[in-house]
Amino acid sequence: IKYCGTGGVFSKGTRVGAQQYTPEEVAAIVDESHMHGRKVAVHAHGANGIKVALKAGVDTIEHASLIDQEGLELAQKNGAFLSMDIYNTEYTQSEGPKRGELEEFLRKDREVAQLQRDNFKKAVQMGIKLTMGTDTGVHPHKDAPKQLAYMVQYGMTPMQAIQAATKVGAEALGIEQTAGQVAPGYSADIVAVTRNPLDDIHSLDNIAFVMK
């Protein structure tokens, strides 16, 4: 179950990070979802909306651009996952005008991009669970590997970035017993690249072969 806990970059007329639900409303969303065996994801840029979600027991935070130190510590304590799509601003700023995106959206993206990256680096240093996100609908899936290079640039090792896109992603979705690893009994699409991604993470931008 996903809900929009704060204003967004591509939300017309909203302030990025403005809290949109009361703590009581968020608690009801999380409690009902968990009671039915569903995980809860929240679209949240702003620090207050993030902390309300984490205190209610949300499972994953999407974006987490303006998360503060208290929010980082809550995520660490709760074992929550952060999905911080730190490549997206390059795509938004280069392709947004061609797609007719509003200047409001482009401006808001510029305002939060570096803050999100700085907070991603802090999260890496704290050992918080980070998974790769694509921001579906904003960023094309074919460019998803570009996120990995930025994750390395902002503090991860290449192996940590690859695991964020595979093993940790499966854990975030609750399917870690059947996916996320190349192991007996697991489902996986296996890719081949021309160079070792542990030496050059950009090699994952050019997939030579996919074995389903």
Feature map (PLM): residue ranges:
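Active-site loop ensemble at the mouth of alpha/beta enzyme cores that anchors a bound cofactor
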Residues: 81-85, 89-107
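Histidine/acidic residue-rich metal-binding segments in metalloenzymes
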Residues: 1-5, 9-82, 98, 110-130, ...
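Catalytic metal-binding/acid-base residues of hydrolase active sites
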Residues: 45, 87, 137
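Small/polar (Gly/Ser/Thr/Ala-rich) solvent-exposed segments
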Residues: 199
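His/Asp/Glu-enriched, well-ordered alpha-helical/loop segment
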Residues: 35, 39, 100-104, 111-196
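Short, small/polar residue-rich loop motifs at catalytic or cofactor-binding pockets
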Residues: 203-205
